[in-house]
Every structure is written in C-alpha cells, then in structure tokens.
Amino acid sequence: YARLSKSERLQRVLKLLKDRKWHSTRKIINQAHVCAVNSIAAELRMNGYAVECKRVGDVWRYRLGG
C-alpha cells in the first residue's frame, strides 16, 4: 500500500475528508482527481485513518471518522 507521505493522491483525498462530512464516490473522484475510491479508503486505513463508508441507495459515501 502507499504511504501517505509519498502519495499525493492519498493526500488529496484525506484533505477532502478532513471536514468529517459524508462525500459520495463521485464527489471524491471529481474533487480529488482520483479513481478507485474504495482502494484509497483502504490505503488510508492502513495509514492509520478511520475512514468510514456507507451505502445510501446506489451511492457509496465516505467520511473520516474517529
């Protein structure tokens, strides 16, 4: 997995999630310019961040917990 200190893509997503609000997969893709949000969430967890996810209808949402 990628280390946060060496991954701009993880840093961009973490910056977005730091407001602790729920963000849809689409919003994260568009605002952080990434893909595979579920993989990024897993990598952030491996870096010690409590990323939560939930499904609302057909939309997955993510936020920084803890």
Question: Could you say what each language-model-derived stretch is?
Answer:
Residues 4, 31-32:
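Residue-level marker of alpha-helix boundaries and capping positions
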Residues 34-39:
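Short, basic interhelical loop/turn and adjoining N-cap
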Residues 7-22:
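Short amphipathic alpha-helical interface segments
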Residues 22-31:
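Short acidic, hydrophobic short linear motifs in intrinsically disordered regions
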